[in-house]
């Protein structure tokens, strides 16, 4: 359920006032999960939404919304957006490069996939060093800024859908329910069956498991 003040278009209007038009809000989902990819979204909202933000009334940081609210808002955001795209970086890249570089990579992939190039970025908390566009990095940007909040919803819904699909193959792990987060049920599944190829082996409690405990669940009836 949404709490507190809704995100505003103050940042977007300030950028429009100095001539920017294709303003991309960027955020990620799944950074703290034990399993699955980190997913980033980039979204460019139209000028009419920046002029009239009530067109996206209800948009907030995705963590403050119910799953049903996120899906309904996802449909509204993507139908109104000038452009949107997602980038996804899998667990093995997170393990080899670290979660922060993987998050930056997911954001860069999302930007490269935009059908309309952005000319300025509004990003939640993470600076894209070396990226050839001006950027505003906002702490708690998904709470403060409408474009970033919209990106957070897109990233969360798209990642949830991926994890639900993963759960149809790796049926013992409950991915559709916990989406890869560190719940008691997830920890129990890890204890019983060991990690899958989609688990982040550098994250606790995964990194505390002996390599001998890493099972090939496909041999026990699971699918990759």
Swiss-Prot record:
GO terms for molecular function: manganese ion binding; RNA binding; RNA-DNA hybrid ribonuclease activity. Manganese or magnesium. Binds 1 divalent metal ion per monomer in the absence of substrate. May bind a second metal ion after substrate binding. Its EC number is 3.1.26.4. Residues 21-223 form the RNase H type-2 domain. It catalyses: Endonucleolytic cleavage to 5'-phosphomonoester. PROSITE patterns: RNASE_H_2. GO terms for cellular component: cytoplasm; ribonuclease H2 complex. NCBIfam families: PRK00015.1-3. Belongs to the RNase HII family. PANTHER family: RIBONUCLEASE H2 SUBUNIT A (PTHR10954), RIBONUCLEASE HII (PTHR10954:SF18). This is Ribonuclease HII. It comes from Roseiflexus castenholzii (strain DSM 13941 / HLO8). The gene is rnhB.
């Amino acid at each position: 359920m949404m709490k507190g003040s809704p995100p505003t278009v103050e940042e977007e209007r300030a950028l429009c006032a100095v001539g920017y038009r294709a303003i991309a809000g960027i955020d990620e989902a799944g950074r703290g999960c034990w399993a699955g990819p980190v997913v980033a979204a980039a979204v460019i909202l139209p000028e009419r939404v920046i002029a009239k933000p009530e067109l996206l009334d209800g948009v907030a940081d995705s963590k403050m919304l119910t799953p049903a609210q996120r899906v309904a808002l996802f449909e509204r955001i993507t139908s109104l957006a000038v452009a949107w795209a997602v980038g996804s970086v899998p667990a093995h890249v997170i393990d080899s490069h670290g979660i922060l570089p993987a998050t930056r990579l997911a954001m860069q992939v999302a930007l490269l996939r935009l059908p309309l190039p952005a000319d300025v970025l509004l990003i939640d908390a993470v600076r894209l060093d070396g990226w050839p566009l001006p950027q505003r990095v906002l702490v708690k940007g998904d709470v403060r800024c409408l474009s970033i909040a919209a990106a957070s919803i897109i990233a969360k819904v798209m990642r949830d859908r991926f994890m639900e699909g993963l759960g149809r193959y790796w049926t013992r792990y409950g991915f559709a329910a916990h989406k890869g987060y560190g719940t008691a049920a997830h920890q129990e599944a890890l204890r019983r069956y060991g990690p899958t190829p989609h688990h982040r082996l550098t994250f606790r409690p995964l990194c505390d498991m002996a390599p001998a405990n890493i099972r090939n669940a496909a041999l026990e009836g699971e699918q990759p």
